Amino acid sequence: MKYLLIATSLLYTLIQTQETVKPVRTGTHSITIQWISFNKFTPGKVFIKKTGDDEYSIQGEQRDRKSNEYVTIKGTFLNRGRILKFNGKIVSKINTINGGQPCELNGLSIFKASGKRQYWRLQQMLNCDGQTTDYIDIYF
């Protein structure tokens, strides 16, 4: 009986957790990479569109027209609340990193909103140069 109560309690918690996943707001959101936004807040824009149950498409960029530095994103994601399971392509180009060459990330990636943050941060933070950390954020 004790184990039945524990199992029932866990199942109830799991169901409640799944029900509390809020839909992602569709439309325009801000995107940043810290190298372009450092000392100024000039976010880029992404457009998010619902394509199915908890499924969305995303496309957009942040670009500095003076330096031609940028981050672009195009793909789809599954909404898991504070975690987005992204599948697609992210390209960043910062003149002082990776020899000024674009860094391309393809396939499955995770964005996560930790604590009270109001944005999802890309969890695969290592740039193609193998030593630089990029913070790519998509704001709620």
Please provide the spans of the model-predicted regions.
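An anionic, turn-rich surface loop/hairpin at beta-sheet edges
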Residues: 86-115
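Hydrophobic/aromatic beta-strand elements that line small-molecule binding cavities or substrate pockets
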Residues: 45-49, 72-79, 106-113
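Tryptophan-anchored aromatic micro-motifs
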Residues: 19-49, 58-62, 118-126, 132, ...
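A short, polar/proline- and glycine-enriched secondary-structure boundary/capping micro-motif
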Residues: 68-71, 95-104, 130-136
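Mature extracytoplasmic domains of secretory-pathway proteins
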Residues: 50-97
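Edge/loop elements at the starts and ends of beta-strands within beta-rich repeat scaffolds
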Residues: 79-84, 113-119
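Hydrophobic h-region of N-terminal signal peptides that target proteins for export
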Residues: 5-16
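Edge beta-strand at a domain terminus
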Residues: 71-74, 78-83, 123-140
